[in-house]
Amino acid sequence: MRRESKQMTIFRSGDQPPGWCELTDFEFVDLTDQPLPIPLAAEKQRLLVTSGSCCVRSAEGAQVLSEGQFLDMDGANGPFTADAGEGAAQVLVFYGRWGNELGGCGVFKLGPDTPVPVRGDPVNYPKSTNFDSHYHDCDEYWVIIEGAGTVVVGSRSFEVEVGDCVAIGMGHHHDLSEVWSDVKGAYFETTLEGRKRFGHLWEHTHGPADVRPERV
């Protein structure tokens, strides 16, 4: 049985996320030179490479992917296997029920930094990074791959570490305000809603956020 997340906004692989989440689970998979089956286990599934390069094989053929690239795993094209060739690689598999119009997906890195003027919205909390406070016209999920720091979502802040997934509801401002050790993370912006704008949005440029208050 999957356990309930201890915090509404942060969950880990195998936890039960909040009911509003389109991301229902995630899993890290380490790859070697031996082909490894990647089972289809959800309505929607996406494989994101988080380190190295790998080759994903399916009924459609083979696709080589490098860090930051992803592949949507359509059940009609299964079964799927993946290997890292002569090297090593890690992939992150997202499971869920998102739609067809999506935001961005990839890998980000952030270290301790002296704040510099950024295009984000103004903040009133301690901040030591040049990451910008912003919102989206979709939900977003951050999975911490390396490092630790402080994430701010709306009026709440959370300490995050390796293996944490931060679920960020549509319209809620969010920020990676402090980093205790260099952070590497994966991000996935799921179904676009409302005005369906993509990318980082700021109230001083794009107008008031379309906040979904129940998504906390």
Swiss-Prot record:
Q: Which UniProt keywords apply?
A: Plasmid
Gene3D superfamilies to which the protein is assigned, alphabetical: Jelly Rolls
The residues covered by the Cupin type-2 domain are: 125-176
Pfam families documented for this protein: Cupin_2
| Classification via InterPro entries | Cupin_2, RmlC-like_jellyroll, RmlC_Cupin_sf
The protein here is known as Uncharacterized protein y4oW
